[in-house]
Amino acid sequence: LEAPEKVVDATHPFALEISKNLMNFCLTCKIPYIRYERPEEPITGENIYFVNDIKQAAEKAKTLGKHILLTLGSKNIEPFLCENFQGRVHIRMLPDPKLIDHLLSKGVPPARIIAIQGPFSVSMNQAMIEEYSIDCLITKSSGKEGGVPQKISAAKELGVSVIVIKRPDMNYPVSFCDKDEIINIHSK
């Protein structure tokens, strides 16, 4: 098996461990590492709050909403599984039986799990917000691919507060936000 000429890391903006492992692998094997970073979508408006992590999101949500929609998936949501949030949180996540079982084992009631594949249109986000009487939506700053513009638009139109978890800082040796630029530069 031949070693690759270079590695392009196009993982999720919040997949830090995978990126760290790839950078270490590339450093060890002396292979060029290139990061494709999804472009961030500009997020502005009233009732939008930025936080650094899931714990800060939980703290902020305590004061913002009675009915919260987590659009973060099923990982690292422990701060929302405490007494303060019982009966208040709906978790939108991929329809993976293992992930659903994991949440059920943590005591999340089935009625609080929305297992569905996204990303979603503005109208689909609005339908979920209205169906569950959501007054606070929590998302990650995961860009267009993560459906962030549609989530923000839906929440704004319905007057729902939004908590956005900012992307974690990571010092990538080489990083691009344009797929075509990576292809053009590195295909030569």
Predicted regions and their residues:
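Redox-cofactor binding/interface segments in oxidoreductases and associated redox assembly factors
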Residues: 8-9, 70, 139
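Short acidic-hydrophobic, aromatic-tinged amphipathic segments that line or gate anion-handling sites
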Residues: 48-55, 174-185
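Active-site glycine-rich loop that binds ribose-phosphate moieties when present
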Residues: 49-63, 72-75, 120-122
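Structural motif
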Residues: 5-6, 67, 135-136
